[in-house]
């Protein structure tokens, strides 16, 4: 069940269906309430102590969660919509076992479902979990730490922590940070670094741990010097811009000018609220410089001129015997030069000079254990600067100092000063990964580490946490190593293992990682599309590795895999199977085929393991004929190879065909697509034959069929029931047991009454399909009723019902709901063993099923995707969020052309159309750019890239800096660096060649000069290639031949295109303002291309228990149990901290949810503290201009305002608006929301004219995207009326308020509170307008102003009323609603569903109850602190989500 429940939740979160989670978390929730609730509460306290350790201080980062623990039960507040969840791992990872329980062929299906993933569903170990959680909460040890020369430090630690983490804590604190070589002693016994604190017998509350300085070794001395260097350049953002050491940027502190929590409330009249020019409505191209504010002052003071290893290294023999370890050379700010010796006791100045070696100590000698102490002693300016750096470092938020899990690259960078740095130089040329790699054995055995961590025990919660933490740590290190290695390979810094072969056939091993290039080396992919197939194969292989890792079958192993795109080349990095290099592949493979099915092998152990995995992945076991015409059984695609390593482990590799092929992009002889698809232009012949369907699609398809199956069965059962009723009157009873047996057969189970389980499963499924959930639920009730009535039916009739339903939905089995796919069904050259017609093994049936799944994608999923975005509830902001949304619906990006065609006919989806067109242009350009880069010498990289950017983004002169003759001259003797230059190129090569035919299958043996010579590319030729690529790859006519026409026709911003393209291909440009309209000189010069960085694809490991806690917490929130929800989500955050450390995308999702809950529970200060951490985390982990970061900024601005930081709230909104416009332009529904917020706050500050500009823009956008009959439009009219009335323009105000009133009256009725408020507003405005008119008339008649006329008094709104309005705009509406009302709503809904009432009747019923609850003030049984969030359907939340009316509406 674990995976299954997770899958449901993941489904709900991915599709943004706020209602789905409740039902699908049922199992978990019941377990938690029954057995585990008492244990869940203490979890936040452990999170506290954890964060103490992670963050190095117990204040900024851990306050909120800690405070919550003691909070009285403030009784529940509003449900947070589920879309927040996306706690999936960022790869749209739905779990693999979604339907395993209900439609497995084997009787023991359920046992198998649970086996592979003991990973953490509470029901998997209901008995053991109590002990686990008790163990988890054994926390809160307070110890004193005594360091030499520093005050005793008192810290609270978690018993789960390792001693090593106290080391880390001390190295992070200001007073002890300069120590690295020390041990920790308790009662004179040295503590083991890798021991858990709870394992230390004599450690108790109040114990004192002593820090004891240890003698240095060569390694420790090097570590110390590196640490000193890191401390000195801690404030320097250069590493973050260069993409080194997992450093990244955050600008929240710069924007808020310090910690928000330390700020005093601001008086409205003291706020500077003028928006910068670039955030006011109407900006055409936003500037680039504000993206990185305060760049000039980012770097701290300089403490030393030079700190480097000395040229006198290493110490000669005699000096080694005196204990010398290494020599350093230092130039201080006072221009003094020193040579320093490191010995086992510490550091001292020696008497060497640049010319003479004299290692004796200087006179007077000063030996310091810490290099910082020695430098402070010899240089006063060092001492001052170091103190300043330390102060600034410790003032920064803890999250600003921790390394990110993976490197985040910046696409724009200022000019960086290049300083002398010996350690950086050493890192660049050493083959190791830096000092942390100096472990026994020197190079790491990545494969052994990756597989051993997966083999760790996982029975109990602490074991699973340890296992997941180890997997995550090793995976992170592997990704870092693989990325470095791939760059070294392309830069020509690694020797090939087959140096004699053609450069593009070369393979490499570096640091125990195997690297191969994305070319078709031995015509392996010749039949499948050559280089184009070879280029995409690693990506499909990575998808396969991901899903097999998610299933996690014990005994089945995959390789560590990372795919890196760098400088136009695709490099695959894999861990090495032990023994694989010692034998030929033919001897190694014991399962699968190495020649696409000509020879096929099978192996009983592999069949057993893959059969288990296949149940989750919906892979159908099938038989194929080998070269001797013998049938061979397979449980995977033919290409999937099984190799037993020298370590005895069963490895699978080449998983590129894990999922069935996409017949819409294959031209096949024996496939006839439906008329609708043919009319839409399918099949489109793709340039490779590896296209396959996504896992999300298969899950949605099976879910859809299951709903149909239940419906059809229900109809037949009702007919049977009617027949039985008539028979009953004749009095022919049948034994009840027989009927129950028959009914249970619906689920394909034997003699077990599974109908309840089946109905629950169906409820879960039905709820996660938004459009059909209500009818499906009605059907479930019908089938329940029918089954109970049919208890008297006989087995034969029930079996007949199931048989008919199976036939109707196209099940593989006649008498059972069974949907699995044969991935080889259309593979060329494979001979299948055809089974009997109508059985699972019938090839015709398998083909039809794959065809139907592909048809389902086009006819159901694409319309569902568009329908979901019609509400603009969580609109994509850039190409990445659009791609994620498409993937969550199971739609591949190759369907983007079809999606654009549909969006182009819908004016209300204009913004999405523009984002999609931009993404398509960027992807088409990427294909061309990769080939272009492969044909460029390293000497000309910056000139070639700037030339390409000029051709893409400008119409001005694009004279390349290198003449074409010179380029040819260089090309003749191109050096090693570019030896991978392909004669065929990578993906996207075919469209470059003038000879290439329409379907991209040109021979590609010779490059035309237009391709081989980058200097000949012009804006016109590049855009022609982009148009051609759009047509060939996406079957879409791009109607523009230059950037100008793209801008005018599609509304694309050049700066947005520059950002998207740089991020997609890994270019870093100089941070400056670019004049794209320049007619006299090229926009981009050589110096504007600062760097190229790798684009890395890998599988991020998951934290299963945290995920379960999170989804259970969401279920609680949806039921209105906010306190319990808060505690569960705090628990999830605590577990995430345990697995991932302090910084991770998923931690950010938890923080955002906790902040929202705190706000709804009435604790705005708590919300502010937590949300501040969420913003910093998103900036650092996702990127400064990532869509999530914009979302976090808008949330933070609301909580800032609620805390009285009015000016700060505006600054945060200005930042969010700037980033929005930079990414996608002003024409976007989310900009309307931000503008409404800005307008309201400006209005509160009395800046009416500015306020009016923003609200007018918001109204224009709301009218465009929501139509005139929508809540956001009514609110915009009302806000506009408020602002105009304050300006004295009562006539306009009156007209606008009338619009609001007419909307409320027609949509909500005359007696609704909002309608009455609007009517009152109209009355006051009319009164003021009449009064003003009377005054004007008096003035006109008398010709002069009279002094006795009373002035018109305009009251500015109170801050409280502004906050209420902000909550309304952002979809947070606080309503008092009692438990009695909830019961009423629930019974009302059930009644309507039974009667099969239309949806709008149900909504009316809910609205009337909620309205009644509101009008009665506090209803019976109402707790004054009972707060419910009710967001009208269509009202937008800040984060662009839709909230359900109440818990009841989600049932």
UniProtKB/Swiss-Prot annotation:
GO terms for molecular function: mRNA binding; ribosome binding. It comes from the Eukaryota. GO terms for cellular component: cytosol. GO terms for biological process: asymmetric neuroblast division; intracellular distribution of mitochondria; mitochondrion organization; ribosome localization. Residues 9-53, 989-1010 have a biased composition (Low complexity). Pfam families: CLU (PF13236), CLU_N (PF15044), eIF3_p135 (PF12807), GSKIP_dom (PF05303), TPR_10 (PF13374), TPR_12 (PF13424). Its main location: cytoplasm. The keyword Transferase does not apply. The keyword Cytoplasm applies. The modification Phosphoserine is found at residue 270. It is found in: Cytoplasm. HAMAP family: CLU (MF_03013). This is Protein clueless. It comes from Drosophila yakuba. The gene is clu.
């Amino acid at each position: 069940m674990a995976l299954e429940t997770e899958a449901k939740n993941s489904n709900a979160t991915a599709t943004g269906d706020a209602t789905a989670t409740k039902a699908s978390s049922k199992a978990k929730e019941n377990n938690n309430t029954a057995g585990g609730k008492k244990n869940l509460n203490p979890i936040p306290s452990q999170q506290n102590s954890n964060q103490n350790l992670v963050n190095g201080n117990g204040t900024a980062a851990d306050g909120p969660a800690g405070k919550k623990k003691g909070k009285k039960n403030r009784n529940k507040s509003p449900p947070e919509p589920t879309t927040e969840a996306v706690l999936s791992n960022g790869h749209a990872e739905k779990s693999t076992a979604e339907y395993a329980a209900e439609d497995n062929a084997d009787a023991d299906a359920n046992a198998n479902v649970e086996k592979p993933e003991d990973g953490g569903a509470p029901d998997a170990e209901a008995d053991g979990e109590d002990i686990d959680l008790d163990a988890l909460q054994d926390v809160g040890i307070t110890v004193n730490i005594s360091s030499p020369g520093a005050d005793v430090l008192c810290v609270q630690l978690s018993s789960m922590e390792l001693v090593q983490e106290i080391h880390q804590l001390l190295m992070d604190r200001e007073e002890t940070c300069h120590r690295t070589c020390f041990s920790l002693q308790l009662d004179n016994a040295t503590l083991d670094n890798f021991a858990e604190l709870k394992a230390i017998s004599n450690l108790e509350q109040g114990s004192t741990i002593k820090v004891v300085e240890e003698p240095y070794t060569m390694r420790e001395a090097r570590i110390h010097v590196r640490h000193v260097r890191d401390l000195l350049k801690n404030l320097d953002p250069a590493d973050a811009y260069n993409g080194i050491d997992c450093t990244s940027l955050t600008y929240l502190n710069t924007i808020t000018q310090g910690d928000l929590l330390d700020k005093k409330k601001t008086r409205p009249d003291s706020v500077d609220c003028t928006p910068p020019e670039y955030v006011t409505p109407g900006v055409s191209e936003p500037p680039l410089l504000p993206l990185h504010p305060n760049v000039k002052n980012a770097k701290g003071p300089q403490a030393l001129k030079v700190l480097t290893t000395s040229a006198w290294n290493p110490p000669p023999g005699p000096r080694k015997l005196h204990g010398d370890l290494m020599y350093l050379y230092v130039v201080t700010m006072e221009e003094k030069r020193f040579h320093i010796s490191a010995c086992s006791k510490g550091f001292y100045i020696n008497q060497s000079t640049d010319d003479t070696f004299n290692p004796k100590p200087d006179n007077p000698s000063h030996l310091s254990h810490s290099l910082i102490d020695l430098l402070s002693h010899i240089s006063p300016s060092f001492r001052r600067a170091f103190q300043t750096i330390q102060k600034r470092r410790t003032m920064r938020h803890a999250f600003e100092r921790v390394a990110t899990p993976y490197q985040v690259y910046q696409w724009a960078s200022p000019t960086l000063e290049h300083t002398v740095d010996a350690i950086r130089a050493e890192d660049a040329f050493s083959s190791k990964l830096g000092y942390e790699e100096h472990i026994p054995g020197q190079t790491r055995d990545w494969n052994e580490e990756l597989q051993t961590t997966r083999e760790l025990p996982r029975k109990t919660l602490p074991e699973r946490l340890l296992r997941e933490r180890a997997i995550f740590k090793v995976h992170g290190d592997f990704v870092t190593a693989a990325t470095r290695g791939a760059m070294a390979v392309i830069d020509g810094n690694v020797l090939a293992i087959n140096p004699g072969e053609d450069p593009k056939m070369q393979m490499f091993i570096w640091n125990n990682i195997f690297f191969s290039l994305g070319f078709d080396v031995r015509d392996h992919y010749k039949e499948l599309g050559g280089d184009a197939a070879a280029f995409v194969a690693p990506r499909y292989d990575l998808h396969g590795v991901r899903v097999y890792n998610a299933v996690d079958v014990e005994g089945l192993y995959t390789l560590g895999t990372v795919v890196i795109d760098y400088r136009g080349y695709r490099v695959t990095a894999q861990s090495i199977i032990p023994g694989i290099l010692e034998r030929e592949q033919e001897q190694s493979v014991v399962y699968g085929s190495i020649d696409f099915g000509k020879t096929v092998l099978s192996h009983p152990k592999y069949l057993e393991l893959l059969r288990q995995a296949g149940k989750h992945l919906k892979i159908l076991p099938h038989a194929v004929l080998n070269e001797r015409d013998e049938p061979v059984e397979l449980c995977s695609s033919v290409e999937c190879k099984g190799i037993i390593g020298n370590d005895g482990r069963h490895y699978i590799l080449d998983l590129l065909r894990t999922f069935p092929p996409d017949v819409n992009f294959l031209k096949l002889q024996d496939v006839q697509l439906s008329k609708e698809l043919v009319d839409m232009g399918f099949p489109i012949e793709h340039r490779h034959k590896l296209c396959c369907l996504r896992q999300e699609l298969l899950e949605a398809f099976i879910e859809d069929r299951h709903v149909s199956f239940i419906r059809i069965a229900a109809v037949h059962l009702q007919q049977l029931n009617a027949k039985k009723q008539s028979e009953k009157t004749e009095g022919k009873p049948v034994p009840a047991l027989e009927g129950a047996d028959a009914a249970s057969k619906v689920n394909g189970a034997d003699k077990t009454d599974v109908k309840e389980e089946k109905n629950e499963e169906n409820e879960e499924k039905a709820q996660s399909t938004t459009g059909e959930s209500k009818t499906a639920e009605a059907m479930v009730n019908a089938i329940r009723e029918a089954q109970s009535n049919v208890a008297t039916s006989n087995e034969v009739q029930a079996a007949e019902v199931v048989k008919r339903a199976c036939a109707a939905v196209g099940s593989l089995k006649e008498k059972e709901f069974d949907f699995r796919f044969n991935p080889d069904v259309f593979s060329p050259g494979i001979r299948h063993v055809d089974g009997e017609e109508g059985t699972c093994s019938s090839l015709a049936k398998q083909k039809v099923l794959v065809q139907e799944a592909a048809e389902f994608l086009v006819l159901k999923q694409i319309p569902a995707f568009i329908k979901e975005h019609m509400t603009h509830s969580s609109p994509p902001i850039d190409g990445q969020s659009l791609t994620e949304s498409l993937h969550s619906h199971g739609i591949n990006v190759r369907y983007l052309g079809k999606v654009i065609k549909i969006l182009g006919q819908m004016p209300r989806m204009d913004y999405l159309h523009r984002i999609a067109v931009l993404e398509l242009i960027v992807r088409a350009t990427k294909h061309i750019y990769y080939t272009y880069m492969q044909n460029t010498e390293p000497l000309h990289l910056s000139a070639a890239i700037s030339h390409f950017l000029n051709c893409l983004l400008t119409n001005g002169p694009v004279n390349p800096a290198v003449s074409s003759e010179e380029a040819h001259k260089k090309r003749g003797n191109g050096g090693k660096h570019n030896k991978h230059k392909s004669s065929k190129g990578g993906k996207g090569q075919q469209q470059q060649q003038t000879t290439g035919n329409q379907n991209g299958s040109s021979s590609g043996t010779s490059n035309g000069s237009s391709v081989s010579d980058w200097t000949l590319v012009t804006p016109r030729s590049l855009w022609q290639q982009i148009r051609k690529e759009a047509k060939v790859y996406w079957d879409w006519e791009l109607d523009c031949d230059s950037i100008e026409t793209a801008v005018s026709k599609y509304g694309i911003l050049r700066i947005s295109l520059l950002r998207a393209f740089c991020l997609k291909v890994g270019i870093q440009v100089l941070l400056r303002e670019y004049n794209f309209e320049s007619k006299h000189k090229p926009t981009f010069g050589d110096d504007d291309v600062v760097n190229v960085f790798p684009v890395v694809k890998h599988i991020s490991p998951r934290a299963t228990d945290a995920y379960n806690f999170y989804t259970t917490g969401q279920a609680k929130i949806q039921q209105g149990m906010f306190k319990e929800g808060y505690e569960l989500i705090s628990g999830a955050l605590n577990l995430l901290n345990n697995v991932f450390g302090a910084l991770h995308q998923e931690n950010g999702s938890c923080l955002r949810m906790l902040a929202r809950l705190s706000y709804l529970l009435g604790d705005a200060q708590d919300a502010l503290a937590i949300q501040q951490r969420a913003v910093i985390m998103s900036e650092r982990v996702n990127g400064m201009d990532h869509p999530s970061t914009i979302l976090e900024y808008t949330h933070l601005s609301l909580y800032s305002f609620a805390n009285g930081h009015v000016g700060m709230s505006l600054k945060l909104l200005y930042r969010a608006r700037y980033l929005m416009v930079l990414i996608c332009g002003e024409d976007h529904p989310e900009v309307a929301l931000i503008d409404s917020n800005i307008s309201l706050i400006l209005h509160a500050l009395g800046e009416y004219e500015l306020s009016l500009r923003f609200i007018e823009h918001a109204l224009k956008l709301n009218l465009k995207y929501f139509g005139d009959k929508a809540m956001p439009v009514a609110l915009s009219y009302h806000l506009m009326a408020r602002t105009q009335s304050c300006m004295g323009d009562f006539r306009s105000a009156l007209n606008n308020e009338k619009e609001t009133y007419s909307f409320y009256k027609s949509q909500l009725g005359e007696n609704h509170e909002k309608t009455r408020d609007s009517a009152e507003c109209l009355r006051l405005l009319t009164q003021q307008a009449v009064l003003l008119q009377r005054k004007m008339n008096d003035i006109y008649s008398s010709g002069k102003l009279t002094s006795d006329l009373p002035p018109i008094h305009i009251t500015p709104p109170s801050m409280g009323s502004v906050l209420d309005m902000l909550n309304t705009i952002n979809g947070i509406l606080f309503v008092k609603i009692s438990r009695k009302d909830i019961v009423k709503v629930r019974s009302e809904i059930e009644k309507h569903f039974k009667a099969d009432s239309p949806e709008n009747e149900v909504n009316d019923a809910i609205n009337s109850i909620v309205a009644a609850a509101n009008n009665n003030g506090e209803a019976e049984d109402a707790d004054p602190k009972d707060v419910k969030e009710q967001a009208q359907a269509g009202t937008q939340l800040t984060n662009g989500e839709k909230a359900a009316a109440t818990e009841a509406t989600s049932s």
